[in-house]
Amino acid sequence: MQDRQKAQDYRALLLADTPLIDVRAPIEFEQGAMPGAINLPLMIDDERAAVGTCYKRQGADAALALGHRLVCGDIRQQRLEAWKAAYQRFPNGYLCCARGGQRSHIVQRWLQETGIDCPLIEGGYKALRQTAIQATWQLAQKPILLIGGCTGSGKTQLVRQQPNGVDLEGLARHRGSSFGRTLNPQLSQASFENKLAVELLKINARQTLKRWVLEDEGRTIGANHLPECLRERMAQAPIAVVEDPFALRLERLREEYFIRMHHDFTHAYGDEAGWQAYSEYLHHGLFAIRRRLGLQRFAELTDTLDRALAEQLSSGSTDGHMAWLVPLLNEYYDPMYRYQLEKKAANIVFRGTWQEVANWLKAQ
């Protein structure tokens, strides 16, 4: 057996993007997994549920026997071939189950019978998860600087350019607003937190870190919420506010939401289905804030959106979208953000255009 038979240096494993062959049931994997893990379960959900019920009623020996009866013959062989293929693809990988218990040991033993010595994570996913939680808490204690500004100010781009910048929206796969979803579905809360922890660990390991640079976010980014330890620190953090001309903000939003999203949808689904998905995406974003707009205003902007989509479909022009985007910014997004920023006015340490804020950051 290899020297790396069991692993307890969890931070090193996370920092190295160590491939994990996660043998938990799909439902467990969906609830939370580590970045880079692939789910090749020993038991699928129904099998796991049956074994769990048996364990409660008849004890461990009966549950283990049932598990072996459920995963035998062709089913066992198919799963074994999948684990072998995964190990051949990731020879530096580790087996991982919930706590480093029966499931990963069984898979390890079956692989040994074929001549493959695959190490396992001692303590399993639970140990890695605790390491991620502790790392986030520890690293969140470092100083933080927030980048603020109204929608379309280029905050995310500015954060990404900083060597100590953490793109929270990229990690969450969501841009924060009602139009913020991307083509990639959001991760579960635990998986998002795990991914954030690994990102913090990596950035911290690359350099002598004086502070984090983050975008000024609310408690939630789409369906994901920020860890409370980080959110508490952000609430007290200094803020550099980007104040770009309205016309420049509109051009950024045009590029991001009308040109790039249209391209991404059609690239993913084809012209016809992609257009339908793009149209539904814009309608859904507007629908999500209908009560805050008022139903009459929502209906008016929806009609304008429909006309803009018809124009874009027929001519390729995105100009028509300005007729509903401009009032949406003026009547909803800008007042909302300015109200939120006003409550944190004492934290503002710099204001300027995007380039001025970028230059200020370099000088710090």
From Swiss-Prot:
Protein keywords: Selenium, Transferase
Entry EC number(s): 2.9.1.3
Q: Which Gene3D superfamilies match?
A: Rhodanese-like domain (3.40.250.10)
Q: What GO terms describe the biological role, i.e. biological process, of this protein?
A: tRNA wobble uridine modification
Kindly give the SMART domains that the UniProt entry links to this protein. Answer: RHOD
Q: Which reaction does it catalyse?
A: 5-methylaminomethyl-2-thiouridine(34) in tRNA + selenophosphate + (2E)-geranyl diphosphate + H2O + H(+) = 5-methylaminomethyl-2-selenouridine(34) in tRNA + (2E)-thiogeraniol + phosphate + diphosphate; 5-methylaminomethyl-2-thiouridine(34) in tRNA + (2E)-geranyl diphosphate = 5-methylaminomethyl-S-(2E)-geranyl-thiouridine(34) in tRNA + diphosphate; 5-methylaminomethyl-S-(2E)-geranyl-thiouridine(34) in tRNA + selenophosphate + H(+) = 5-methylaminomethyl-2-(Se-phospho)selenouridine(34) in tRNA + (2E)-thiogeraniol; 5-methylaminomethyl-2-(Se-phospho)selenouridine(34) in tRNA + H2O = 5-methylaminomethyl-2-selenouridine(34) in tRNA + phosphate
Q: Which molecular function terms from Gene Ontology are attached?
A: transferase activity, transferring alkyl or aryl (other than methyl) groups; tRNA 2-selenouridine synthase activity
Q: Does the keyword Transmembrane helix apply?
A: no
Q: Which residues form a coiled coil?
A: none
Instruction: Name the residues annotated as catalytic in the UniProt entry.
Output: C97
What InterPro entries does the record tag this protein with? Rhodanese-like_dom, Rhodanese-like_dom_sf, SelU
Task: Pinpoint the Rhodanese domain residues.
Answer: 14-137
Q: Does the keyword Phosphoprotein apply?
A: no
* Described function: Involved in the post-transcriptional modification of the uridine at the wobble position (U34) of tRNA(Lys), tRNA(Glu) and tRNA(Gln). Catalyzes the conversion of 2-thiouridine (S2U-RNA) to 2-selenouridine (Se2U-RNA). Acts in a two-step process involving geranylation of 2-thiouridine (S2U) to S-geranyl-2-thiouridine (geS2U) and subsequent selenation of the latter derivative to 2-selenouridine (Se2U) in the tRNA chain.
Subunit-level organization: Monomer.
Name the family the entry cites.
Belongs to the SelU family.
This chain belongs to the protein called tRNA 2-selenouridine synthase
The record lists the organism as Salmonella gallinarum (strain 287/91 / NCTC 13346)
Gene it is expressed from: selU
